[in-house]
């Protein structure tokens, strides 16, 4: 959540950030401006009424001590108190309206984030590893998966519905090996391995920004205040919900392997075949909580940690700086890692590493104490990596002419 003080004192800065995101909020933003104007006016009136109440109360006390008639002053105090209570209630209601709007306003766009309306304006930063030149036409992963008996898409549909899969046989061993490899690399880079619940309450999803704006994107448990997690970012970040951390304990670096669940609302017709876009998928996540001065360096650290895994698996990839119009709700700055998929002849996202600055920390009340003063921490999150998409990339990049899959040396010890 952005700072309410900023919204009240520099509304135009917030409006400009929304414009950069290609998200002007239209009439809603103007209505918010009107509410803020009324709220500020009422605060000034409240100050005046309170000052008057204090002044008359003092006079009332003096006259009472002097045993002088105070009936007029008493009436003034009573009338003023009624006005105070009414205005205080009205201001409180306006404050609630502002806070509700605040909860659906996305993070401020970082100065380093380039301007752009959509993903077409994203900027490639660098490429790592050169894509292999095939002497045959490479197949897509769903063909290879079925040929090798690694993934059973039909059974996924039978057990649930479309966008679910069953991984079995040697494919399941590869899948498990990828998870172990990812966790080992992340731990080597200083991230504590944590296993968390796959269900969270509404407060936790508010803390990381999924609620209230993106309610349709998450699965809710019927008759319970519980939701299936869309990412371990939710659980790892909220381990420190409403917590004050000693500055000596920063940064906090965490990694978790979890199943993730997403409704994929608005994705109809996209990636309908294979494992690219699923309702349930596994992901190894990185989350860091840092001092504000250290979050930029941490973002680079997290990117390199994810890139190390792809290099070990001999998978060509690139870093892409997202433009302002392609940023996620809670992100101030995001760099994607895209992996090369020869079957599709393009790069596809396999990790997004985002710096949320103090946006999530303000929502979740994640603070640190330095010099006897509580301050908001910075939070970062990123995949390291999406397991299914890594398996997709492995199949497509390491396929042989006969459809078999070469297994990278880095995975051998896990098989």
Predicted regions span which residues?
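TRNA-recognition modules of translation machinery and tRNA-sensing kinases, especially anticodon-binding
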Residues: 127-415
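N-terminal alpha-helical targeting/anchoring segments
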Residues: 1-132, 150, 154
């Amino acid at each position: 959540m952005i700072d309410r003080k900023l919204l009240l004192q520099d509304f135009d800065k917030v409006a400009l950030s929304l414009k950069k995101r290609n998200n002007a909020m239209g009439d809603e933003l103007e209505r918010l401006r009107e509410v803020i104007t009324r709220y500020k006016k009422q605060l000034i009136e409240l100050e005046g009424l309170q000052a008057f109440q204090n002044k008359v109360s003092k006079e009332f006390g003096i006259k009472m001590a002097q045993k002088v008639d105070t009936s007029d002053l008493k009436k003034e105090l009573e009338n003023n108190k009624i006005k105070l209570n009414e205005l205080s209630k009205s201001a409180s209601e306006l404050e609630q309206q502002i806070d509700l709007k605040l909860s659906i306003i996305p993070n401020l766009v970082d100065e380093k984030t380039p301007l752009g309306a959509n993903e077409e304006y994203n900027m490639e930063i660098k490429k790592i590893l050169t894509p292999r030149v095939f002497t045959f036409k490479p197949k897509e992963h769903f063909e290879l998966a079925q040929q090798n008996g690694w993934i059973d898409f039909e059974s996924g549909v039978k057990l649930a519905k479309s966008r679910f899969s069953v991984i079995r046989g040697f494919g399941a061993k590869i899948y498990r090996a990828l998870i172990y490899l990812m966790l080992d690399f992340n731990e080597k880079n200083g991230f504590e391995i944590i296993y968390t619940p796959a269900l969270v309450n509404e407060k936790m999803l508010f803390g990381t920004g999924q609620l209230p704006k993106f309610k349709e994107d998450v699965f809710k448990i019927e008759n319970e205040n519980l939701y299936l997690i869309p990412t371990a970012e939710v659980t790892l970040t909220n381990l420190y919900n409403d917590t004050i951390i000693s500055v000596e304990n920063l940064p906090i670096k965490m990694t978790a392997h979890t199943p993730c669940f997403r409704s994929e609302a608005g994705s109809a017709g996209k990636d309908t075949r294979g494992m690219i876009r699923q309702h349930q998928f596994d992901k190894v996540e990185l989350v860091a909580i840092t001092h504000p001065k250290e979050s930029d360096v941490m973002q680079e650290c997290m990117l390199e940690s994810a890139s190390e895994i792809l290099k070990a698996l001999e998978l060509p990839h690139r870093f892409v700086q997202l433009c302002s119009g392609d940023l996620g709700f809670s992100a101030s700055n995001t760099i994607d890692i895209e992996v090369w998929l020869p079957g599709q002849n393009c790069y596809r996202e396999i990790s997004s590493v985002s710096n949320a600055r103090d946006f999530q920390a303000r929502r979740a009340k994640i603070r640190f104490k330095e010099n006897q003063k509580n301050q908001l921490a910075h939070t970062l999150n990123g995949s390291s990596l999406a397991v299914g998409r890594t398996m997709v990339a492995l199949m497509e990049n390491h396929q042989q002419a006969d459809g078999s899959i070469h297994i990278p040396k880095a995975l051998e010890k896990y098989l």
